[in-house]
């Protein structure tokens, strides 16, 4: 089995072969830190976290770098609105990012470079572009000469003659008169009144958006990397411009593989802050009461390259699915001791191979999840037999292997059982009273084994039963 990934650059699935055997360099375009992350961000970072986890599971050494854009017009506007500094805004939402990602069980990157911490590298790269004739200074600004780079458009498939002027970057009207060509984009912007600025060979100013990532990739990972990832909305102009800047200087491919995740849609439109149709991660988790694992499952149940529709019905389906998976993930904790699981076991090789076959096919997480659900449903069936009939339908050690397989493979997807207390809170009073009634009926029928099984089952969920005179049973949560 060999991992194949869809490469946006070649527009086909390709066998993954890293530059250095056994090691993977991976760069992800991070957030512009001026607001809380929304569901679109969650999708992107869950997808790339899953890619990273899978590469680690395959045995690769992975160096994962993800930047923060902390110099940007949006941050400046927010700082003016709130009467504070750009750094204060950036620091606040950088911290919020870490909090949100931790809740979604996203592994921390190996390095989080910031634009403000990479200014020397940014200026060196601009100077090299200027020396090689790919950049020119104009009244304190510096622009990249798009027509000088012969391969411009190779990632997005766009041709200059089909583009509108200014399409290659974030443009201010004052810039147009300084450009040699309308398609050129800013590498360095001259200082403006009441805006942060840094000294440079071209005068005080700040970097353009695209040059930041090119410099951070080069500084942290080198001239060429294995995989560059981001949202599909970054293919053009951001990633196209990254390629132009980096390859104009080095003469080497910036990345072997370019991977892009699809957008989250609301009512047929991309979820974005500019459209005002976004829902933040915090709103979903805190106000909506959605479990982080349900949100993760929502992302993984769809092909990562395709758009995904955000609806209440889709979330509810994922909620139901997560309840099934979580019941399976908790099976060993509830029943392992009673089933005599003492020896360690390895994962089921056939099921593991099916999981890997799915993931090797361009991260086919829907097919990989099908393996997990097959295991979880079997564990749930066996649990029902244990509760209601007091026996298993099959071999206890094989069931142990299936549970271990489920836990490990779910972990590759970042899906981990939540604490028992979360599950206990979902068992409402009516359900508890129903179990007590079933236990009472079992005792009346002198089926004390069944009565004990129900007591143990509820105890595993944090429910203690207290039998009192007159056949009354009270309960409490522990």
Swiss-Prot record:
Gene responsible for this protein: cysS
GO MF annotations, alphabetized: ATP binding; cysteine-tRNA ligase activity; zinc ion binding
Catalytic activity annotation: tRNA(Cys) + L-cysteine + ATP = L-cysteinyl-tRNA(Cys) + AMP + diphosphate
Source organism of the structure: Synechococcus elongatus (strain ATCC 33912 / PCC 7942 / FACHB-805) (Anacystis nidulans R2)
Gene Ontology terms: cellular component: cytosol
EC number: 6.1.1.16
Entry similarity comment: Belongs to the class-I aminoacyl-tRNA synthetase family.
Listed name of the protein: Cysteine--tRNA ligase
Domain of life of the native organism: Bacteria
Listed InterPro entries: Cys-tRNA-ligase (IPR015803), Cys-tRNA-synt_Ia_DALR (IPR015273), Cys-tRNA/MSH_ligase (IPR024909), Rossmann-like_a/b/a_fold (IPR014729), tRNA-synt_1_cat_dom (IPR032678), tRNAsynth_Ia_anticodon-bd (IPR009080)
Record Pfam families: DALR_2, tRNA-synt_1e
Intervals of motif 'KMSKS' region: 270-274
């Amino acid at each position: 089995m060999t991992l194949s990934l869809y490469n946006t650059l070649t527009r086909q699935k390709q066998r993954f072969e890293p530059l250095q055997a056994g090691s993977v360099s991976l760069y992800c375009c991070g957030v512009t830190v001026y607001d809380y992350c929304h569901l679109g961000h969650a999708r992107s970072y869950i997808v790339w976290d899953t890619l990273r986890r899978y590469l680690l599971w395959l045995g690769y050494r992975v160096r994962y770098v993800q930047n923060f854009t902390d110099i940007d017009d949006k941050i400046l506007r927010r700082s003016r609105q709130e009467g504070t500094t750009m750094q204060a805004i950036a620091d606040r939402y950088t911290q919020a990012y870490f909090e949100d990602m931790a809740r979604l069980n996203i592994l921390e990157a190996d390095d989080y470079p910031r634009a403000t911490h990479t200014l020397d590298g940014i200026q060196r790269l601009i100077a090299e572009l200027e020396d090689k004739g790919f950049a020119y200074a104009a009244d304190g600004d510096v622009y990249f000469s798009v027509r000088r780079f012969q391969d411009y458009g190779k990632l997005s498939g766009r041709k200059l003659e089909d583009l509108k002027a200014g399409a290659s970057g974030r443009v201010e009207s004052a810039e147009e008169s300084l450009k040699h060509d309308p398609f050129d984009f800013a590498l360095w912007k001259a200082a403006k009144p009441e805006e942060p600025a840094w000294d440079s060979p071209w005068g005080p100013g700040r970097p353009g958006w695209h040059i930041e990532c090119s410099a951070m990739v080069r500084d942290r990972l080198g001239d060429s990397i294995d995989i560059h990832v981001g949202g599909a909305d970054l293919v053009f102009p951001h990633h196209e411009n990254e390629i132009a800047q980096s390859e104009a200087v080095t003469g080497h491919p910036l990345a072997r593989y370019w991977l892009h995740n699809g957008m989250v849609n609301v009512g047929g439109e991309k979820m974005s802050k500019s459209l005002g149709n976004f829902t933040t991660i915090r709103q979903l988790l805190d106000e909506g009461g959605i479990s982080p694992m349900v949100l993760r499952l929502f992302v993984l149940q769809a092909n990562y390259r395709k758009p995904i529709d955000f609806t209440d019905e889709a979330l509810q389906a994922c909620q139901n699915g997560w309840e099934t998976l979580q019941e399976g993930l908790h099976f060993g904790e509830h029943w392992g001791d009673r089933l005599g699981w003492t020896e360690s076991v390895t994962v089921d090789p056939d099921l593991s191979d099916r999981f890997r076959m799915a993931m090797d096919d361009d991260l086919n997480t829907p097919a990989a999840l099908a393996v997990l659900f097959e295991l979880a449903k079997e564990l749930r069936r066996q649990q029902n037999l244990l509760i209601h009939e007091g026996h298993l339908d099959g071999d206890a050690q094989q069931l142990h292997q299936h549970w271990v397989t489920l836990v490990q493979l779910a972990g590759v997807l970042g899906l981990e059982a939540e604490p028992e207390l979360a599950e206990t809170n979902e068992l409402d009073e009516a359900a508890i009273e129903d179990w007590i009634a079933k236990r009472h009926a079992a005792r009346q029928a002198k089926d004390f084994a069944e009565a004990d099984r129900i007591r143990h089952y509820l105890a595993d969920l944090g429910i203690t039963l207290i039998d009192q005179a007159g056949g009354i049973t009270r309960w409490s949560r522990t």
